[in-house]
C-alpha cells in the first residue's frame, strides 16, 4: 500500500474562472536522503474564493501512475486481466471499460465487496491474488455482475509504490505545474503515512476465516474487528467490545480501539 499525505496547495498569481489539477500531477520529497515522487489520484477543479485559488485537503500518494489496456477476446480461454506490477497499490485501482476501438464511450466499474444486490447489469469487478503475488481483475458472468463483450477495452490505472519507504515525508515541492501555474505554496496537513508491505501469508491465514465468518455482517465483536481491518488497512491491531463490558456499562453500542501501523492517524 502506498503512503499518503494530505496537503493544501495555494496557487499564487493565478487567474481565470477555475484551475484544474490533473490526475497524476507530481510532487517531490526526500526521506532520509532518498528522493520520492508523490502524485494525485484524481482530477480536482477549484474556483477562486475572494480571489484566492486554493486546493484544500489534497491527498498525495507515493509512486508512479501506470495504465494497462486489454481488448476482450472470448475466444482466448486463457485471457486474464492482470495487474502486472507486484508493488501495485490495489486501493488506488481505477477500472474503466471502453465500448470498442471505434466507440470511445467509457463506463467505470467499482470493486464488488459482496454479492448482495448484484444483478446482471451491475458494473463491478472482482480482485483475486495469483500464485506469484500479483493481482487479477475479473468481471461478472451476466448473472452476477455485467458480462463484458468481445471488443470491449479494459483499462486498468493504478499506482506502483515503494510501500513503506516514504512514510514520514513532510515537505513537498511541485514537480511540474498545475493548470499552467508553477508558483505555489504547499502546506502539509498530514505527513505521509500508511505505506506498508503486502499482507503476509500468516496474516491472511488468520484473517480470512474471520472475514468469511462475518459475511460482511457486524454482529459479534470479532465481526467488527474483521470489518474494521478491511476498512482501515493502516490498522496494525484492532480490538472491539460491547459497551456493556465497560466499567461503567453503556448498552446498545460497540466500541473499537485501533492502533495505527504508522503515523498517529488513520487514512480514510
What are these regions (language model features)?
Residues 1-268:
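Signature of Asx- and small-polar-rich beta-strand/turn repeats characteristic
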Amino acid at each position: 500500500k502506498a503512503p499518503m499525505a494530505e496537503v493544501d496547495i495555494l496557487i499564487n498569481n493565478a487567474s481565470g474562472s477555475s484551475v484544474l489539477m490533473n490526475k497524476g500531477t507530481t510532487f517531490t520529497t526526500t526521506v532520509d536522503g532518498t528522493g520520492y515522487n508523490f502524485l494525485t489520484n484524481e482530477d480536482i477543479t477549484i474556483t477562486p474564493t475572494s480571489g484566492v485559488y486554493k486546493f484544500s485537503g489534497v491527498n498525495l500518494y507515493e509512486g508512479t501512475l501506470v495504465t494497462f489496456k486489454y481488448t476482450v477476446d472470448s475466444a482466448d480461454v486463457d485471457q486474464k486481466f492482470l495487474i502486472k506490477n507486484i508493488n501495485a497499490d490495489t486501493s488506488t485501482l481505477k477500472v474503466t471499460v471502453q465500448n470498442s476501438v471505434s466507440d470511445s464511450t467509457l463506463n467505470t466499474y467499482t470493486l464488488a465487496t459482496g454479492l448482495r444486490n448484484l444483478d446482471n447489469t451491475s458494473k463491478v469487478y472482482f480482485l483475486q491474488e495469483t500464485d506469484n503475488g500479483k493481482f487479477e481483475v475479473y468481471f461478472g458472468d451476466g448473472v452476477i455482475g455485467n458480462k463484458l463483450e468481445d471488443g470491449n477495452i479494459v483499462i486498468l490505472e493504478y499506482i506502483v509504490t515503494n510501500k513503506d519507504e516514504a512514510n514520514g515525508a513532510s515537505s513537498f515541492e511541485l514537480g511540474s505545474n498545475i493548470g499552467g501555474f508553477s508558483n505555489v505554496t504547499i502546506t502539509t496537513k498530514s505527513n505521509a503515512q500508511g505505506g506498508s508491505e503486502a499482507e503476509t501469508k500468516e496474516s491472511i491465514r488468520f484473517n480470512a476465516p474471520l472475514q468469511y465468518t462475518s459475511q460482511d455482517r457486524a454482529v459479534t465483536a470479532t465481526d467488527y474487528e474483521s470489518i474494521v481491518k478491511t476498512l482501515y488497512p493502516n490498522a496494525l491491531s484492532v480490538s472491539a467490545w460491547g459497551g456493556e463490558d465497560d466499567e461503567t456499562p453503556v448498552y446498545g453500542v460497540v466500541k473499537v480501539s485501533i492502533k495505527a501501523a504508522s503515523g498517529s492517524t488513520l487514512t480514510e
